[in-house]
C-alpha cells in the first residue's frame, strides 16, 4: 500500500476527526452512492465519473478528492452487500440530512448527478436513476419553497 493510499485510508476512516467539513463530504458521498449503487451491473464507469466530479468540486485538494471517492465506495459496498443499508434507507438518510442541515440543498448538483447516466446500460438502472433524480429535484424545490 502506497503512502498516499495509506493516508487516504486513514483520513477516510477518521474523517470525523481529521477532515474539515466532513459532514458535507459525507453528504455528497451519499448522493453519489445512490446513483452508483443503482447500477447493479458494473460500477467501473461510475467511479471514473465520480473521480472527475470530485476533482471539479475539490480542485486543489487531492486528499479530499480521494476521501470523497473512498467514502462513496464504502456506501456503495454497504448497499451492494446489503449490509444494513439499501438505496431506500440511504435516500431517507439524505432526506434527514437535508432537514438537519438546510445548506446541504446547495450541495446537490443535478448536472453532476446526471453525469452517471453516461454509464448505464439497462432499462432498470435508467428508471431507478431517473426516480432518484426526481426525488432530489423534489427535495431541492421543496426546500427552496419552504426557505
Sequence positions of predicted segments:
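Small-residue-enriched hydrophobic alpha-helices in membranes
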Residues: 1-34, 41-147
Amino acid at each position: 500500500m502506497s503512502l498516499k493510499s495509506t493516508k487516504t485510508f486513514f483520513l477516510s476512516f477518521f474523517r470525523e476527526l481529521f477532515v474539515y467539513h466532513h459532514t458535507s463530504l459525507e453528504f455528497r458521498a451519499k448522493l453519489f452512492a445512490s446513483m452508483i449503487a443503482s447500477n447493479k451491473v458494473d460500477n467501473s464507469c461510475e467511479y471514473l465519473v465520480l473521480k472527475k466530479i470530485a476533482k471539479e468540486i475539490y480542485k486543489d485538494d487531492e486528499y479530499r478528492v480521494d476521501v470523497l471517492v473512498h467514502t462513496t465506495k464504502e456506501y456503495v459496498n454497504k448497499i451492494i452487500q446489503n449490509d444494513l443499508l439499501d438505496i431506500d434507507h440511504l435516500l431517507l438518510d439524505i432526506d434527514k440530512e437535508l432537514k438537519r442541515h438546510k445548506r446541504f440543498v446547495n450541495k446537490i448538483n443535478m448536472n453532476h448527478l446526471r453525469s452517471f447516466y453516461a454509464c448505464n446500460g439497462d432499462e432498470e438502472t435508467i428508471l431507478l436513476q431517473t426516480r432518484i433524480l426526481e426525488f432530489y429535484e423534489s427535495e431541492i424545490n421543496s426546500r427552496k419553497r419552504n426557505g
